[in-house]
Amino acid sequence: MVLLQKAKHAKRIYAELIYTKTNCDGYKEQGITFPACEIQKQLLTDFYNECNISPDKLAFLEAHGTGTAIGDPEELNAIDKVLCQNRTTPLKIGTIKSNIGHSEPASGVCSIAKVIISLLLFPPSKFLYTVKYIIIDYLETRDILNIARNRRREKELFFTHSR
């Protein structure tokens, strides 16, 4: 369960929800579940422009990361184009789906819970110790950072959940 309330009324604060935004790209031949890099790029660009946060301040991103041959490269491409072009430090990326699978309508809440718990414990991924072959070509020119063993606390977090 996630309880959202005003900070002044909270007994304990685990995380703050600064801004939210969503979009939909279901008007295409392949259907709503087929990912589209351009639509994801637009969502990320609009999000950071509207909430007035520089993507360079982002330390960690909890991605949708379904582990599919089509979805992961599309999502990584959008993340790279919007969040990584001017970075001087690596952007750490994670996904809960490598531990629990895709929980369909609850996947966004699972991602939020994972990151909040990670701020305290940072549990390693159960299955993903190497980058899957479907994204190796895309990441060939990138530094790959395995965050499974990184236990540092991060302050700037972002969740992406697109369908």
Protein language model regions, located:
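Condensing-enzyme catalytic core of the thiolase-fold
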Residues: 1-163
